[in-house]
Every structure is written in structure tokens, then in C-alpha cells.
């Protein structure tokens, strides 16, 4: 992407020439920072080289390089770096439509964002869309679907229908997203298929949606045809490895239909050497279908994933030591692996909380358990609320707290499992009407802090381009 410098009449040309001369004198010809090289390094996953190049260009005032730098910060998923990225995008947003889009997407996906931030996100995304930026309508739709109370005058379905009528390419996917977030996907499989067949050549996330549709409809012939098309796209570089990984995960998901784990394994084996995240997908597949390999194979996959700093590999390895099925149970080893994944994988906090709550390290650590479980719950880990309710009701290593136990058992009812519903009923019985009213107030307060449809932020991430220049 070309660098956009602020334009000043008369001095624009001289200014940019002077900056380039300065860059050469600063870096010497051989080490000249290069936006294109930085973009390519980012696509290869070489964030160190990309960061060095972007940093030098950003220091010279190139707004697009500032955006690239912020993209890397967002990619770390480290809250402190994401905060920094927000400031960087904001600084570049006046001159860079790309920064407007990025900041809009960041604010739309920000946990616990204020109503003012929701409105700022809306205005930025609309502005970026008007400036020709892609991937702006999907997060805008997400904003309307996830925070209806912030936009009481917007009817999401009506808005999406208008976009479709205007022929905007992203409108179809926004419709698919609406089906997903409102739980009506299965009733609209034909519509999802129609939308995604039409958008397949321009939007490779549609391979994932179509694979899902064909699994749910039990249509192996169409699925095979789709995979053939996808492989052709991979060889032409029009389909990313990340998409192939997602499609393989769909094929290996027994909740969608009859799984085809062997095809999933073959797809992942092919891309893993160049796309390390797939080593972990292979390990997960093996975990779900143990007949595909043995413990040595599992460890090979996970070692490859860990060598490429994949937090999902640490999470899965921690899980193996936590459960003790593939390897002997070892709470200390599990804790060490989960700690490496904390801040990057939500479930790591959940498992650490369970280790501390259940006393797997020799004694119960109630405060540590609560800290981790609450973090997990607020980041969308459903089962964490149930574990917190148990922590407060059982009082292991701490005094029982009936009110808080009630609050989190009510939140856990969202899981809709017999255990969660039974616990909620059991904890509600001894409370006075005043305590129940106070409990319900606290439930609403906690839900407001989390934002509605907390899970759908995951959908937003799933629908974002994660490769190179098009990351968040």
C-alpha cells in the first residue's frame, strides 16, 4: 500500500523527498525500511522484521506504517499492546481511511466498551466505508447485533437488507452473521449457500460457511467439489492457509454432522509446515479422534506448534496434563503450560481457576481461583460461571457466600445444562425475596459489564481477515 503523507500545498513534494533522503541517511541504502517488505514479512508471520520496518517508517511520520505497527500490536492479543494500538490508530485516523477502519473494528470488538465508544466505532466504520475501505460493513453489522441498546433506532435486519439492495459485496456476509448471532443459521442453510456461492471468488471465508452448510445438510458430493475448488484456490494463492485450517476444523467437528476426520488431517498436514497454527489443529483433531495417531504423533504436533509460539499448543498440552488421559496427570506441568497461554487463550484462565479451586496442587487457592475464573467468564468462557458458583457455594478453603453463589449460578444458566439449572434452583431456595432482588441486580450489573452476546465477538474475529495487511 502506498504511503500517505499529510499534504501541504507547495511543500508536499519537497517534504516527501526530504523525508526519503532522511530515511536513506538514517538507515543506509541496504537497511532502508520498506513498507512492501514489512507487509510481506507480516504475511509470512515474520512479525519481528515487519515491526522493525514499520517502526522506522512510523517514526518518520508515515501514517500507513503507523497502522501496520498497530496491526502487529493487536496481533499480540496483549491488552497493554492493544491499548497502544488504539492510540496509534487514533493518531493516524485523520489522514488514513485504513486507520479509521482499524480503529472502528478495534472499538467494535473491545470488551466492555462504553456507549460513546460504540458510537465512535459506528462513525469511523461508516467514514472508512465511504472512503472505499473493505471489511467495514461486517463489523458495523456486528456492532448493531451485539449492542442493540446502544443503537435503539437501528433495525439490524432492515439495515442489512438495504445494503443488499444497494449491491454492497459485504452485505451477504453480514446477513450470514445475523443468522449466526441470532441462532437461526440452521433454518437458513439454503440462503447461506446462495449468498456464499455468489461471493466465493471474492470472499474466502465463504469456503468455511459452505463447508459448514454441506456438513449440516449431509452432502458429501458437494463438499468434495468445494474442497477441489478450494485446493485450486490455494495453488493460485487466492485462498489463505488460515481458511484451509478453518475448513479442516469444520470437517472434523462432529457437532455439525458426520465428521470426515481423515480428509481434515490430510488438509492440515499439507499446510502446517507453512502455517504453524495448523500443527495445533492437527493435535486437536488427534485429541478428538485418537484413532488417527498415537501419543508420539500428538507430542510431535504440539512441539511443532510450541516451537512457533502457538498459545493454543500450550493450552492443549496443559489440558493433556490436567486430564491425564494421553499422559500421566501432572497438575504442576499443566499449570506451567496454562500460564504460558494466559492472556492469549481464554480457556487457560478457566483451567488455572479449576486447578486452584479443586486443590490439585495440594491445597485450595480460593482468591487465585476466583481471579482466573472471573477473567475467563468475562471473556466469554461459559463454564466459568458454573465453577465460580461452585466456589462460592462449597466454600472450600473459604467461607461460603450464598449471595454471590446465587449470582453466578444465575449467569451459569445461560449454558442450559442440567447441572447448571439444578445448581441455580438449589441456591435460590434458601434466599429471602430481598436477597433475590439484590442478586438479580448484581446479575444485570455483571451482564452489562460483559456486553450482550459476549460470544459473538468471537464471530467477529472469525470473520476478520487475519493475513498480512488485512488483519484487524
Model-derived segments and their meaning:
Residues 419-472:
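Terminal, low-structured helical/coil segments at or just beyond the last alpha-helical repeat
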Amino acid at each position: 500500500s502506498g504511503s500517505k503523507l499529510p499534504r501541504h500545498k507547495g511543500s508536499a513534494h519537497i517534504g516527501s523527498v526530504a523525508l526519503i533522503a532522511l530515511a536513506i541517511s538514517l538507515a543506509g541504502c541496504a537497511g532502508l525500511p520498506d513498507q512492501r517488505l514489512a507487509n510481506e514479512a507480516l504475511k509470512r508471520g515474520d512479525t519481528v522484521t515487519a515491526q522493525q520496518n514499520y517502526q522506522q517508517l512510523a517514526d518518520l511520520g508515515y501514517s500507513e506504517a503507523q497502522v501496520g505497527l498497530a496491526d502487529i500490536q493487536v496481533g499480540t492479543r496483549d491488552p497493554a499492546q492493544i491499548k497502544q494500538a488504539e492510540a496509534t490508530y487514533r493518531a493516524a485516523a485523520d489522514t488514513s481511511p485504513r486507520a479509521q477502519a482499524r480503529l472502528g473494528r478495534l472499538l467494535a470488538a473491545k470488551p466492555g466498551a462504553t456507549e460513546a465508544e460504540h458510537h465512535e466505532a459506528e462513525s469511523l466504520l461508516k467514514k472508512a466505508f465511504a472512503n472505499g475501505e473493505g471489511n467495514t460493513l461486517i463489523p458495523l453489522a456486528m456492532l448493531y447485533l451485539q449492542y442493540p441498546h446502544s443503537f435503539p433506532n437501528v433495525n439490524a435486519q432492515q439495515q442489512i437488507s438495504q445494503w443488499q439492495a444497494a449491491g454492497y459485496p459485504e452485505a451477504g456476509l453480514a446477513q450470514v452473521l445475523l443468522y449466526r448471532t441470532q441462532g437461526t443459521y440452521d433454518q437458513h442453510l439454503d440462503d447461506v449457500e446462495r449468498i456464499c456461492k455468489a461471493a466465493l471468488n471474492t470472499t474466502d471465508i465463504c469456503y468455511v460457511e459452505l463447508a459448514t452448510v454441506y456438513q449440516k445438510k449431509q452432502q458429501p458430493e458437494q463438499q468434495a467439489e468445494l474442497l477441489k475448488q478450494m485446493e485450486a484456490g490455494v495453488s493460485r494463492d487466492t485462498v489463505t492457509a488460515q481458511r484451509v485450517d478453518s475448513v479442516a476444523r469444520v470437517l472434523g467437528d462432529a457437532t455439525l454432522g458426520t465428521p470426515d476426520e481423515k480428509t481434515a488431517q490430510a488438509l492440515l498436514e499439507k499446510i502446517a509446515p507453512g502455517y504453524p497454527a495448523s500443527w495445533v489443529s492437527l493435535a486437536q483433531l488427534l485429541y478428538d479422534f485418537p484413532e488417527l495417531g498415537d501419543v508420539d504423533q500428538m507430542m510431535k504436533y504440539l512441539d511443532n506448534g510450541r516451537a512457533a509460539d502457538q498459545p493454543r499448543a500450550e493450552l492443549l498440552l496443559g489440558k493433556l496434563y490436567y486430564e491425564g488421559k494421553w499422559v500421566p496427570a501432572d497438575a504442576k506441568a499443566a499449570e506451567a503450560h496454562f500460564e504460558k497461554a494466559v492472556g492469549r487463550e481464554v480457556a487457560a484462565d478457566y483451567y488455572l481457576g479449576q486447578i486452584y479451586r479443586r486443590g490439585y496442587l495440594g491445597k485450595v487457592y480460593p482468591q487465585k481461583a476466583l481471579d482466573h475464573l472471573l477473567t475467563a467468564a468475562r471473556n466469554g468462557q461459559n463454564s466459568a460461571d458454573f465453577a465460580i458458583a461452585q466456589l462460592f457455594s462449597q466454600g472450600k478453603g473459604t467461607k461460603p457466600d450464598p449471595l454471590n453463589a446465587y449470582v453466578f449460578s444465575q449467569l451459569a444458566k445461560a449454558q442450559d445444562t442440567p447441572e447448571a439449572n439444578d445448581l441455580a434452583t438449589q441456591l435460590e431456595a434458601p434466599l429471602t425475596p430481598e436477597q433475590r432482588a439484590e442478586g438479580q441486580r448484581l446479575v444485570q450489573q455483571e451482564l452489562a459489564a460483559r456486553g450482550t452476546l459476549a460470544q459473538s465477538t468471537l464471530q467477529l474475529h472469525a470473520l476478520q481477515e487475519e493475513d498480512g495487511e488485512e488483519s484487524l
